[in-house]
């Protein structure tokens, strides 16, 4: 099924869909979903051997500054499976740039109805400094051994900035 058939969400930017490409703590393989067919393709093997610190995916029918859909890390009590759709709400974002342009990573949790374990989380501070440090370190280093690739982490952004990223991503997709 084409991911173009999956809506960006019920109440953008407060309640949005994320399609999971990489489960939390899975083997260091970067998967990319083909947006037309819905199939997952191996994009590359992560040379640093690092594991994604949270589930990683994208908001369908969005377009971010790097020309890809808006990226999202989804913090959950258990890893999710490749290709599943999970309704989320954002806590903030990691602002960064890479060789393709602006490449922000939203940090989100499932909507409260889906996960009582994360319902108390209202901003980035609620996921804990250790996980924030792991996320930042992962994205600073995961491309370190790949020729021609680089990442510059610019810091954290709050919910308002993350909401703007989502709204802009939906608008860019519709252009």
From Swiss-Prot:
Alphabetical GO biological process terms: phosphate-containing compound metabolic process
Keyword vocabulary terms for this entry: Cytoplasm, Hydrolase, Magnesium, Metal-binding
Residues reported in the UniProt entry to bind substrate: 30, 44, 56, 142
Main subcellular localisation: cytoplasm
Cellular localisation: Cytoplasm
EC identifiers of the protein: 3.6.1.1
Function field: Catalyzes the hydrolysis of inorganic pyrophosphate (PPi) forming two phosphate ions.
Name of protein: Inorganic pyrophosphatase
Designated gene of the protein: ppa
């Amino acid at each position: 099924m084409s991911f173009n058939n999956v809506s960006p969400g019920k109440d953008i930017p407060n309640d949005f869909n994320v399609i999971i490409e990489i489960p939390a703590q899975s083997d260091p393989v970067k998967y990319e979903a083909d947006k037309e067919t819905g199939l997952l393709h191996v994009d590359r093997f992560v040379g640093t051997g690092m594991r994604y610190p949270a589930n990683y995916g994208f908001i369908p029918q969005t377009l971010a500054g790097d020309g890809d859909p808006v990226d999202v890390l989804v913090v959950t009590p258990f890893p999710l499976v490749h290709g599943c759709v999970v309704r989320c709400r954002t806590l903030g974002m990691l602002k960064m740039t890479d060789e393709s342009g602006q490449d922000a990573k939203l940090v989100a949790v499932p909507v409260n109805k889906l996960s009582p374990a994360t319902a108390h989380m209202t901003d980035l501070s609620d996921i804990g400094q250790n996980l924030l440090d792991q996320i930042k370190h992962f994205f600073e280093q995961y491309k370190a051994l790949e020729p021609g690739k680089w990442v510059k982490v610019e810091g954290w952004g709050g919910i308002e900035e993350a909401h703007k990223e989502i709204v802009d991503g939906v608008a860019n997709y519709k252009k």
